[in-house]
Amino acid sequence: MSRIQYVDQVDQVELDQQQQPGSSSTVSGSTPPLQISPHGSPSLQQSQRLGKHLSKSASELNGHDCHLSESPHISPKRAKSAVAQQLAGVSSGGVASGVGVLQKTHGFFNNLRHRWSRAKSKDRLGRKSPSDFLEESTDYAADYSSEGSSVTHSPRHRSTTIGGSPLAREFRATAKMAQVIQRFGGSMEGRIDEHPENGSAGCSPPELSTQQQLEALQANELRRKREAQLRQFVFFQLRVHLKSGSDLVAMDKNGLSDPYVKFKVGGRLLHKSRTIHRDLNPVWDEVFIVPIEDPFQPIIVKVFDYDWGLQDDFMGSAKLDLTQLELGKAEDIHLQLCDSSGNGGSGLGEILINLTLWPRSQEDKEMHFQRNSKLAESSKRLKSQIWSSVVTILLVKAKDLPLAEDGSKLNDTHFKFRLGNEKYKSKSSWTERWLEQFDLHLFDEDQNLEIALWNRNTLYGKAIIDLSVFQRENTHGIWKPLEDCPGEVHLMLTISGTTALETISDLKAFKEDPREAQLLRERYKFLRCLQNLRDVGHLTVKVFGATGLAAADIGGKSDPFCVLELGNARLQTQTEYKTLTPNWNKIFTFNVKDITQVLEITVFDEDRDHRVEFLGKLVIPLLRIKSGVKRWYTLKDKNLCVRAKGNSPQIQLELTVVWSEIRAVCRALQPKEEKLIQQEAKFKRQLFLRNVNRLKEIIMDILDAARYVQSCFEWESPVRSSIAFVFWIVACVYGDLETVPLVLLLIILKNWLVRLITGTTDAAAHYDYEYDEDDDDDKEKEEKKSIKERLQAIQEVSQTVQNTIGYLASLGESTINTFNFSVPELTWLAVVLLLGAILVLHFVPLRWLLLFWGLMKFSRRLLRPNTIPNNELLDFLSRVPDNEEINQYRELPPSAPTDQTRNNPKKKLKGS
């Protein structure tokens, strides 16, 4: 593009500005008035200026009235008009009459009126300059000539692409000028400004400088490229991270505000943030994703102050121009808030947000609106899952956390987790140990788990975990260091519940490899039993489906999913919607660390807001598993006592366990792995009574054994006492320390023989059925009992527990008081007895002492039939008082009446 064409465009813009009323142009009347010389004629300079303006004809106002001498194309000089020649003659002679001045003025205004009418006719024609064409915006989805057509191929822009049209010439000239500007940078500006005819040859200077016009052309060209790039996509997703606000305006009487933010597009609400109470520098820290169909439509951001029961106060607003964003790149934006009239100011504050605009295809658009449409397919997967996996997080503990300003521990420490749009806040703890478990849903777009350490309202540190690097269907123990502060957090993380068919956990895509099965069996052979002692075995669980589940929803259906737990490892299936007979068809694998562990299988119903309802539970010890057998298991209730609700609910499983016996034996002699998440026990009347009865049964068994031995001493059955007497003598004469385990082994052998003879192979299962019947009977009896009877039963059990605890406490205190001279006489007696025991045990073997003690017990009935059977040690301790008795034996010091009056101020006032 030549420079003369550029200056012609500038003159055209200047002429349009001159034709507007109120502008500072010579045509509108801002030209300084004609000054008459002392001789009664205009000055020479004013005459030349007036002649230059009058020499322009109406046709010359179309664009070419200023010429650059350096231009290669010089326009021919125009002939001066008659008025101009007369003015020139007047200026040369210096004499003019008053009539000549009036004629010249009259001709000037006629010419001005002619040019004004020509300008108005051009405005009606609607001809636009290149700058107007660049500033014109088009509707986003208006042109769809073809799928591969660009913006200039659309019918709306044919006027700029036809080679012979004036608009096409202007469009090409503007594009060429932009290329020159981009190539030479600021050198072009200097050349135009340095031209001798700029501002000195009669051309009035434009309102905008050349630098500003060049920047405007560059900005328009960049905007045009971005718009062309945006038009290549039909759908977008905008990720908005609302971080914080600063220096917001105070709307309440206390000098604070309760701000929240609304995001709107075309009057439609996209998102509403939570309210931060009493804060002018709020930290929302919220992330959400919204669909964008028209990126040329700005997003309106409004901030309000929440008022309970009243209308919320407006605090400021701002606009988001999505065309300024780079696709796929996260950008931090500071939004300066302005009032409703559009006047901004530092007093209204600003909002800090992070934006990422992702382009999406037509298929993604259809899939998005199909998921969100209420009239989508109404099959059994009506509530189709849009998440890909479930992330189960167990917050265990933290260490080396920062200290408070005074050097003490933080007393209100908690963690906040965020995965996409979902968030979780843990409980506050000052012990740095939480043991909380929760689930978050994993989406394909965002797989970064954000962790933040808070103490009250203060943020101390953050950490980000990339979930894409972790193996699915496996539990991982993680120690994650925190950023911006010292400390680490311990997590147990599991990614399960995958819905894709191509995952390894899907039975339809699973093909059993005989070579892998053989390698798995060889890993736990006897020859390799000492290689890795912690790897006890391998468990494979195939979950096919369930039937007869209870209806948890209003429509008589449920949304069941299955959770499998082995120790602290936790996996789960996907959710099957609107069914009572789900088919999960999943396969899971567990690393067995202890063969004595149990596999817990629980079926839940999924509700909104991550809430679940219990449908059934099953517990299977690993030692009872029959490998490779596909069978149905009955689901039980929460207490694992009776059948769960529903139509005989069952679950179909196939379990396979491979383990090493030597490793299992070594592991059984080590501490058992503690399960981190356990259900918190609450006080229940029935549970309390049941536990007391269990303890009572054990105590009664011990008492029965003691009575059996005492009956042998009392010769209630001569045959039984004779056998016991002979057995005691033989054991004392020939017995040794190995006799103790031999006796225990004989007890086990006796129980095994009883089980073998009676043929009972599964006593636990038989007990479950009886327990179910007893439990049903207990429920019926409980319903018939009155409140008085229930309270009386609780009172009796509580009294028994109270007396037992009191007896044990008294016995322990008496033993302690024996050694601390609470009763000196009894303590010295204990000293004498202990000295005698030392001498006897030193000179007499233990077996002879036991033999003598047995003879005394067996002969008491024969030699001393009237004596009362007793225990000498308990008889001695019963003579020693406990702490309560010592307090009761203590004497009070005698006191005078004056002391009593002084100690009782009420009596003193009454007497006075």
Curated annotation (Swiss-Prot):
Disruption-associated phenotype: Mutant flies exhibit impaired homeostatic modulation of presynaptic neurotransmitter release and altered baseline neurotransmitter release transmission.
Top-level taxon in the UniProt lineage: Eukaryota
Topology in membrane: Multi-pass membrane protein
Membrane-crossing residue ranges in chain numbering: 729-749, 826-846
Entry keyword DNA damage: no
Function: Calcium sensor which is essential for the stabilization of normal baseline neurotransmitter release and for the induction and long-term maintenance of presynaptic homeostatic plasticity.
Designated name of the protein: Multiple C2 and transmembrane domain-containing protein
